[in-house]
A protein has these predicted regions:
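Single transmembrane alpha-helix segments in multi-pass membrane proteins
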Residues: 1-53, 58, 75-79, 217-224
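Loop-to-transmembrane alpha-helix initiation sites
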Residues: 8, 84, 127-132, 175, ...
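Membrane-interface helix caps of multi-pass small-molecule transporters
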Residues: 21, 46, 50, 70, ...
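Helix-loop-helix "hairpin" substructures at the membrane interface of multi-pass membrane proteins
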Residues: 68, 124-209, 214
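Cytosolic-side transmembrane-helix boundaries in multi-pass membrane proteins
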Residues: 159-166, 170-173, 245-288
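Transmembrane alpha-helical segments in multi-pass inner-membrane proteins
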Residues: 186, 190, 196-261
Length: 288
């Protein structure tokens, strides 16, 4: 059970990392997440059931997510459609696209080789190592990218768009690039989770943005004054912590049909804690 919870936390952390690219760096509330996440699962599962190598299927899923990000980016930067509306439009479109890809509302992985099956250990250990390898790879690639001149221009766009433009940075292109990369990472999470769970479903994206945000917020509540690398690692810690919280809710006997409600309550609590701490504990010193 412990290994299973950590495995889920590691893979779901990839979703949090993708959301971090837009929500925290660009200050862009991208609703496309709830479309690109299940889209990644739909593409990977469909290709795997047709005999495609699971690594290639996962790569194709990332490409599909990038296309979803490109669509919302063009609607926002070129079409001048507001952020939330452009995300909702693409998210809604993804639902129909997934039905076209799978030919049905859900599709299972039976008697197929999945990405974690490449490893020679038990199923639980394979899933744990797969999650650890992929989340580490995503963090390293993000750190490498954000340390380049292009990455610094991307960060500057999110920090202060007007100042970035004064330095000759094309902020529209930076936003477009960020949405493409972010949704590619989110689709990767969707592909890995679909393979971990053994199926893809068009409704799998409902509420996943709450899970991703919970990973960010829990990590930020637990840790303060961090470097970029440390912030990315805290997303992983936050994701695993969130999975333990969900497991605790289920273990207490609560109805699992209301899991999305519990998820929203957990996120709301984590968002409220910092403000309550500032309001009631500011300036309070504990006696030795």
């Amino acid at each position: 059970m412990l290994i299973s919870i950590i495995s889920q936390g590691l893979v779901w952390a990839i979703l949090g990392l993708g959301i971090f690219m837009t929500f925290r760096i660009l200050n862009f509330p991208d609703m496309t997440t709830e479309g690109s996440f299940p889209l990644g699962g739909a593409v990977s599962v469909t290709l795997i059931t047709q005999g495609v190598n699971p690594f290639l299927a996962t790569l194709a899923a990332v490409g599909a997510g990038c296309l979803a990000g490109l669509a919302v980016g063009l609607l926002y930067t070129k079409g001048k459609i507001p952020t939330l509306l452009s995300g909702i439009l693409v998210m809604t479109s993804c639902h129909s696209i997934m039905l076209m890809i799978m030919g049905r509302a859900n599709l299972g992985l039976l008697n197929t080789k999945q990405i974690q099956d490449v490893l020679p250990f038990s199923s639980e250990i394979n899933q744990l190592l797969t999650g650890l390898i992929f989340v580490t790879l995503v963090i390293l690639l993000m750190l490498f990218f954000l340390d380049t001149k292009l990455g610094q221009a991307y960060i500057a766009t999110g920090d202060n768009p007007d100042m970035a433009r004064s330095f000759g940075i094309n902020t529209g292109r930076m936003e477009l690039m960020g949405l493409v990369l972010s949704n590619g990472v989110i689709a990767l999470a969707g592909a890995l989770i679909a393979q971990q769970e053994g199926y893809a479903d068009v409704s799998r994206g409902i509420g996943v943005i709450v899970v991703g945000l919970a990973s960010l917020i829990i990590g930020e509540v637990l840790f303060k004054s961090l470097t970029l690398a440390e912030r990315l690692v805290t997303i992983v810690v936050g994701s695993i912590s969130y999975q333990f919280l969900v497991w605790g809710v289920i273990a207490l006997g609560f109805n699992t049909s209301y899991l999305r409600l519990y998820s929203a309550l957990i996120l709301a609590t984590c968002l409220v804690i910092p403000s309550l701490k500032d309001k009631y504990l500011k300036g309070v010193k504990l006696s030795k």
